Design a protein with these regions (language model features):
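Short, glycine-/small-residue-enriched flexible loop/hinge segments at domain edges that mediate gating
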Residues: 16-24
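C-terminal alpha-helix plus adjacent terminal tail
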Residues: 26, 38, 46-47, 134-140, ...
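Short beta-strand/loop segment at the start of cytosolic alpha/beta domains
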Residues: 11-17, 174-177
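Alpha-helical linker/hinge and terminal dimerization helices associated
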Residues: 52-54, 130, 182
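Crotonase-fold acyl-CoA enzyme core
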Residues: 7, 63-174, 206-207, 211-215, ...
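Short, active-site-adjacent cap segments at secondary-structure transitions
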Residues: 24-28, 33, 81
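Terminal peptide-recognition signature
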Residues: 1, 19, 31, 88, ...
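An acidic, glycine-rich surface segment that forms the CoA-thioester-binding/catalytic face
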Residues: 2-11, 32-77, 114-115, 195
Length: 228
């Protein structure tokens, strides 16, 4: 996906992007079973191993990874968890199908994820509910908390997103891109915080509980936490 974000940023004929899922989910996040296979061997996944060529690609490419300065609209067609939720939060405008929901399952599988991004982009109580309780927020709950701009029936989702895109295209591209830069700056946090979050997540991943979380998910059973 990183190449998609880069193409949007470089193409002068693209003013705005719409991000949606191709199936029942907007994005299901990381493959935890894949993670469990690596952890069972005492290894890091390629994206977490500094010695692996794929390490610099991060979690698969998010808009913030290429400093995209064009507006994005999330057309949330289904459930979005983990990295899927992070991508939504990096879209300035969001339209949600009435049957969709968002959630964060990281602590359920012994990981941390990027809660600082949620604390920055969401109402703090909503972010805490998602990150600490592994809770879910329905489309109507997201609308009530101003996490999304609009909730529509699934069959009207893309039309609603395209309507927002058309409104954006009426404005000056230079002014819109400047507004996006300010949007990102006012919602940003110091790089040291992201680095600290990655450090904590990796520390947890290499613990016994980190391996147990992924293993329990793969075996479809409740995890047995050991606090180590």
């Amino acid at each position: 996906m990183r190449s998609c974000w880069r193409d949007i940023g470089l193409d002068p004929n693209i003013y705005v992007g719409i991000v949606t899922g191709a199936g029942p989910a907007f994005c299901a996040g990381r493959d935890v079973k894949f993670l469990a296979q690596y952890q069972a061997q005492g290894k890091r996944t390629p994206h977490e191993d500094p010695n692996d060529p794929l390490f610099h690609w991060g979690g698969g490419g998010q808009p913030q990874d290429v400093n995209l300065e064009k507006p994005l609209i999330a057309a949330i067609n289904g459930f979005a968890v983990g990295v899927g939720l992070n991508i939504i939060l990096q879209c300035q405008l969001r339209v949600m199908a009435d049957g969709a929901w968002i959630g964060d399952q990281h602590t359920n599988v012994g990981r941390l994820g990027a809660p600082h991004e949620m604390y920055s982009a969401l109402p703090r109580t909503a972010a805490a509910y998602l990150t600490l309780c592994n809770g879910r927020l329905t489309a109507q709950e997201c609308l009530q908390q101003a996490i999304v701009n609009k909730v529509v029936p699934a069959e009207q989702l893309m039309a609603a997103a395209e309507q927002l895109a058309e409104m954006i295209c009426l404005g000056s591209p230079l002014a819109v891109q400047a507004a996006i830069r300010l949007y990102r700056l006012t919602a940003s946090f110091p790089p040291s915080l992201s680095a600290y979050a990655r450090h904590l997540d990796q520390e947890i991943a290499e613990s016994e509980d980190g391996a147990e979380g992924a293993r329990a998910f793969k075996e479809k059973r409740p995890p047995a936490w050991k606090l180590r």
